[in-house]
Design a protein with these regions (language model features):
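C-terminal accessory regions of radical SAM enzymes
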Residues: 77, 93-95, 99-155
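Eukaryotic scaffolding regions of large macromolecular assemblies
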Residues: 53-57, 82-83, 88, 111-116, ...
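A structural signal for short secondary-structure junctions
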Residues: 14-15, 57-60, 89-90, 132-133, ...
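Conserved SAM/AdoMet-binding glycine-rich loop
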Residues: 1-64, 68-72
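Hydrophobic, well-ordered secondary-structure elements that form the walls
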Residues: 22, 86, 97
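Short, acidic/polar
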Residues: 4-8, 76-84
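Intrinsically disordered, Lys/Arg-rich low-complexity segments
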Residues: 151-172
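C-terminal non-catalytic interaction/assembly regions of soluble proteins
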Residues: 71, 85, 101-103
């Protein structure tokens, strides 16, 4: 699809209304293999081609990638690598973010509930607690954990234009 054939260019030019949503779902090959998805390099190639077409045709379109956190086999270090690649190297502002939701009859759900890969029998790490899931998802938003962001951002000056009166109403 991302070779020199005209198919992708036709999709971008004539069948995209401004935003093309795609689902690479992760960046790390180890996690993508468990998802049964192709390497992230395919998404990078598609992104390059998309940007070339948009520049050449003077289109102001956006590519919107969708990623999943807390997938079986995905550890915190994988989320940090994802953030480094997607937020740092590719400069995407992520909008499509989802924790894994186990659904019936899927390989991901089998791994989620059993903690193992049914094809190999190998143990697979699964983020189960809310804290583990929160920590993984936090990498989508700035590449650091919320407490690390608080330590590195300056406090904002308070707006003293409005003052609270005795009856809890704001006035100038």
């Amino acid at each position: 699809m991302f070779d020199d054939s005209p198919y992708f260019e036709t999709v971008v030019k004539y069948h995209t209304s401004g935003r093309l949503k795609v689902a690479p779902e992760h960046t790390e090959d180890r996690v993508l293999k468990l998802m049964r998805k192709p390497s992230f390099s395919m998404f990078e190639d598609m992104n390059r081609r998309f940007q070339q077409i948009c520049r050449r045709e003077e289109l102001k379109y956006q590519l919107i990638p969708y990623f999943i956190s807390s997938h079986p086999g995905c550890e915190e270090r994988d989320m940090r690598a994802l953030a480094d690649k997607v937020l740092g190297k590719l400069h995407f502002n992520l909008e499509q973010v989802q924790d894994l939701t186990p659904t019936p009859m899927t390989l991901s759900s089998v791994m989620f509930y059993t903690g193992s890969n049914p094809y190999t029998g190998e143990e697979v790490y699964v983020a189960r607690s809310q804290e583990e899931k929160r920590r993984q998802k936090s990498y989508f938003f700035g590449g650091t954990l919320p407490e690390e962001r608080r330590r590195t951002t300056k406090p904002q000056p308070r707006d003293t234009k409005y003052k609270k009166s005795n009856n809890n109403k704001y006035r100038r």
